[in-house]
């Protein structure tokens, strides 16, 4: 996206200054190639990493569609219009102060800025804005594939461009006219009324009213600048105070909506579990994995420095994720989660030798681990306990060559797949997992959803207890 914008911005500036020359264009592209070469030590590993995971060419994989409506674009002009729910599916993050939005409107009514510049600026704005609505342009700006989380990542480019236009208008504010001010007020008034009728869990009436009041304050300052023919010494401190107030309020309201784990809990958790991890690591000098039957963070293995299975990364290796999913673990495009445990055979194949559980769950109430008769408790630290899997296999072990015939792309039933893997490993026709003969199933607050050879149960009423009786 930086390359696209660099080319766009080069020709934009060249057209404004009317200096599009062959020599200048050659120098620009020559410099761009050198810049790309200097960054190759970083770009090449990233490209290789993405090629094994989420990267794909999807530019022509679907029909041209509209990905969001205008209201989702407008709400991002308001103070505090953000929450953590927008991480995976977010509207365009174009907020960069009400002042910038107003100056952008006034830019097109400023008499000192010639019509050629306005047309060129509008063309660039529209071209970038298309990538917020039309699927083909979104894919074009994002390397021909949709990003995982934090959508519309080129929004910072749009912000940069409109800030430069707003700054140019601010420098020439004395040449703005009152018609532009009236249109700006009407724009924010109509936008406020329009947005107030929508249902957004991160935007309420107080935020909308606050935004409109601040927009009026800016308008008053702009009127003073126009009336007194310039920016006086009083205006600069006043406008600075307004901007600082607005951005501080936006930061506070945005951060307030984000839920964090208490620092005291994390500190206590590390202080308690780290010594336990180190003791467990000292029990064996071979490669093995440690896992938890509760979930504190998605990357606890990195937090506590041990070899684990659970991992969260936006560049997940595709084949690893497929294998983990085929064994029945909870996965997504960015997460592999061990969760509440696995089966003994799968634990053993994956080298999971130690399991950490909470004996008396306080922070993890739903993760009380029920020890199976084959795992032995070897360590205890506070409310945490470590269980050892005596059947854990090393990092490499001999298997029958028939194992090569398996295909993780054809997996339907996880238990059948695990049986096939285990049988092929030892070349024996024996099923570890047996099908239960269930005569009756009673569901309470659950509904069945069939996926190939498996059944998934989903809650009908959230927040209400659900049970399955066999």
Predicted regions and their residues:
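Perimembrane helix-loop-helix junctions
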Residues: 2-34, 218-220
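Hydrophobic transmembrane alpha-helices of multi-pass, membrane-embedded glycosylation machinery
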Residues: 2-14, 48, 106-109, 164
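Membrane-interfacial segments
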Residues: 15-19, 50, 54, 58, ...
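Flexible, solvent-exposed extracytoplasmic
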Residues: 346, 351-470
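Contiguous transmembrane helix-bundle modules in multi-pass membrane proteins
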Residues: 119-139, 145-272
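Periplasmic/ER-lumenal interhelical loops and adjacent helix-loop junctions
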Residues: 24-120, 127, 134-156, 196-205, ...
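Short alpha-helical segments and helix-capping/turn motifs at coil-helix boundaries
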Residues: 87, 103-110, 271-283, 338-343, ...
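Extracytoplasmic/lumenal acceptor-recognition loop(s) of multi-pass membrane glycoenzymes
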Residues: 242-267, 278-352, 393, 398-439
């Amino acid at each position: 996206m930086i390359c696209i914008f660099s080319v766009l911005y080069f020709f934009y500036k060249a057209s404004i200054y009317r200096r599009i020359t062959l020599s200048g264009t050659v120098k620009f592209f020559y410099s761009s190639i050198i810049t790309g070469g200097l960054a190759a030590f970083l770009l090449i590993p990233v490209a290789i990493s993405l090629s094994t995971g989420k990267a794909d060419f999807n530019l022509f994989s679907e029909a041209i569609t509209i990905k969001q409506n205008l209201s989702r674009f407008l709400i991002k002009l308001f103070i505090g219009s953000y929450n953590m729910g927008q991480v995976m599916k977010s509207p365009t993050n174009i907020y960069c102060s009400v002042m910038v939005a107003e100056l952008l409107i006034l830019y097109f009514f400023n008499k000192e800025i010639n019509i050629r510049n306005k047309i060129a600026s509008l063309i660039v704005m529209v071209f970038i804005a298309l990538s917020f609505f039309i699927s083909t342009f979104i894919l074009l700006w994002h390397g021909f594939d949709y990003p995982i989380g934090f959508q519309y990542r080129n929004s910072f480019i749009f912000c940069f461009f409109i800030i430069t236009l707003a700054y140019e208008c601010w420098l020439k504010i004395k040449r703005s006219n009152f018609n532009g001010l009236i249109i700006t007020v009407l724009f924010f008034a109509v936008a406020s009324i329009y947005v107030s009728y929508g249902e957004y869990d991160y935007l309420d009436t107080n935020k909308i009213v606050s935004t409109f009041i601040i927009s009026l304050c800016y308008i008053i300052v702009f009127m003073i600048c126009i009336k007194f023919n310039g920016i006086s010494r009083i205006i600069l401190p006043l406008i600075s105070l307004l901007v600082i107030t607005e951005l501080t309020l936006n930061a506070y309201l945005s951060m307030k909506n984000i839920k964090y784990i208490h620092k005291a809990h994390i500190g206590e958790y590390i202080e308690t579990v780290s010594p336990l991890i180190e003791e467990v690591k000292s029990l064996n000098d071979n490669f093995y994995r440690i896992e938890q039957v509760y979930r504190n963070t998605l990357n606890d293995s990195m937090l506590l420095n041990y070899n684990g299975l659970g991992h969260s990364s936006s560049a997940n290796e595709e084949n690893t994720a497929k294998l983990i999913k085929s064994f029945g673990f909870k996965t997504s495009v960015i997460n592999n989660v061990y969760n509440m445990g696995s089966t003994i055979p799968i634990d053993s194949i994956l080298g999971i030798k130690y399991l950490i559980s909470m004996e008396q769950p306080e922070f993890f109430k739903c993760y009380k681990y029920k020890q199976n008769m084959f795992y032995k408790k070897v360590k205890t630290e506070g409310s945490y306990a470590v269980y050892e899997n005596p059947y854990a296999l090393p990092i490499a072990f001999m298997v029958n060559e028939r194992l090569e015939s398996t295909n993780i792309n054809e997996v339907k039933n996880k238990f059948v797949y695990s049986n096939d893997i285990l049988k092929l490993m030892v070349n024996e026709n024996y099923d570890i997992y047996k099908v239960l003969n269930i005569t009756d199933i009673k569901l309470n607050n659950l509904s069945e959803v069939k996926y190939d050879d498996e059944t998934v149960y989903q809650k009908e009423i959230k927040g209400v207890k659900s049970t399955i009786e066999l």
